[in-house]
Curated annotation (Swiss-Prot):
L-glutamate binds at residues 31-35, 67, 203, 221. This is Glutamyl-Q tRNA(Asp) synthetase. The lineage of its organism: Bacteria, Bacillati, Actinomycetota, Actinomycetes, Propionibacteriales. Zn(2+) binds at residues 121, 123, 143, 147. Pfam families: tRNA-synt_1c. It comes from Cutibacterium acnes (strain DSM 16379 / KPA171202).
Length: 347
């Protein structure tokens, strides 16, 4: 009896109708989308300010989304998210419309997956690492397509030992994404995970669906996430959305070049306030770190500051403690760039 063909799924349209069936008429927007795992540190707040300024200065809405799908890490998601929102308000950052929570949008993610060409994947992270070459940027290892080549019988056998994740059956190896500093750049794409093996929608799926449905057409984030931009842009196009323009900022670090994180001791806004530093001082420092005039109210900068042309993607920058009284023991190699705050103003 001949072996079953590994082509198990019907060929679906390259572009689904998900966007047209789920999207209403929405004005363009920027966004800030924290995960409620801990309080926002200065690096997070700097990204939020940059995203808010870029949106407001280009005539866009600004939306806030809580990315709370990781059940293991967001046990106290409600309380932490409330703290994060208060911190944004304390700095003078406002947003349009209700705050969206990913945990309340599971049906939308399921609908998106239903229209895509997918296959089950049984590989563990260790197996993927062993089957791939050295990782690319940001320690990303493209999936080698192991489970895509399985026969029906092989998949049935693996189902008895492990629940599968769901992967996109990509038809491409590279895809182009647009970054305000890089311009149009082509990057590697692979069969990314859409649904984890515990049934949780994967980050890349949820963020693309939400950006598309919320009208987000500009995304400001740290440059270590650049490697995901081509994959997310491809998925957006497959779902019928126009991929956003990205603005990847220089990565802010603490002592020793370690990326800021609460687990590594990075200070949150409440830590600074408790040490005697006023919210307005924090805003002024964040503006200074972006190469902008030091103001206590970010609204003063909207439509009143010339945004400089983009420069090459910023490198790694360390925080300067001097404007904040040295309370956190950080330093700076250079003034942080304003290059990402550049786009033709919308009429």
């Amino acid at each position: 009896m001949p072996a079953a063909s590994p082509q198990l799924l019907p060929t679906l349209p390259l572009v689904t109708d998900f966007a047209t069936t789920h999207s209403g008429l929405r004005h363009a927007a920027g966004r800030f989308a924290p995960s409620p795992t801990s309080a926002l540190h200065l690096g997070n707040l700097r990204t939020a300010l940059a995203a808010w300024l870029l949106a407001r200065s280009t005539g866009r809405r600004f939306v806030v989304r809580i990315e709370d799908l990781d059940r293991a890490r967001v046990a106290a998601a409600g309380k932490i998210a409330s703290t994060q929102l208060r911190d944004l308000e304390s700095l003078g950052l406002d947003w349009d419309g209700p705050v969206v929570r990913q945990s309340e949008r599971l049906d939308l993610y399921a609908d998106a997956v239903a229209g895509l060409e997918t296959y089950p994947c049984f590989c563990t992270r260790r197996e993927i690492a062993a089957a791939t070459t050295a990782p690319n940027e940001a320690d990303w290892r493209p999936y080698p397509g192991t489970c895509r080549r399985l026969t029906v019988q092989q998949r049935h056998e693996r189902l008895t030992t492990r629940a599968p994740a769901t992967r996109l059956a990509s038809q491409l190896n590279t895809f182009e994404a647009t970054d305000l500093a890089r311009g149009c750049a082509r990057g590697r794409v692979d069969d990314l995970v859409l649904v984890r093996n515990d049934g949780t929608p994967a980050y890349n799926l949820a963020v693309v669906v939400d950006d598309g449905l919320q009208g987000v057409d500009q995304v400001v984030r740290a440059r270590d996430l650049w490697s995901s931009a081509p994959r997310q842009a491809q998925l957006a196009e497959l779902l019928g959305f126009i991929p956003p323009v990205y603005a990847h900022t220089g990565l802010v670090t603490g002592p020793g070049g370690v990326r800021l994180s609460k687990s590594a001791g990075a200070a949150g806004l409440s830590d600074l306030v408790d040490s005697g530093i006023d919210h307005r001082q924090v805003v002024a420092w964040l503006c200074r770190s972006l190469g902008l005039p030091e103001v206590a109210d970010p609204h003063e900068l909207v439509n009143n500051v010339a945004l400089t042309p983009p420069t090459p993607v910023a490198g790694i920058h360390r925080l300067d403690p001097r404007p904040l009284g040295g309370a956190m023991g950080w330093w700076s190699d250079a003034v942080l760039d304003v290059a990402v705050l550049r786009e033709t103003r919308r009429p």
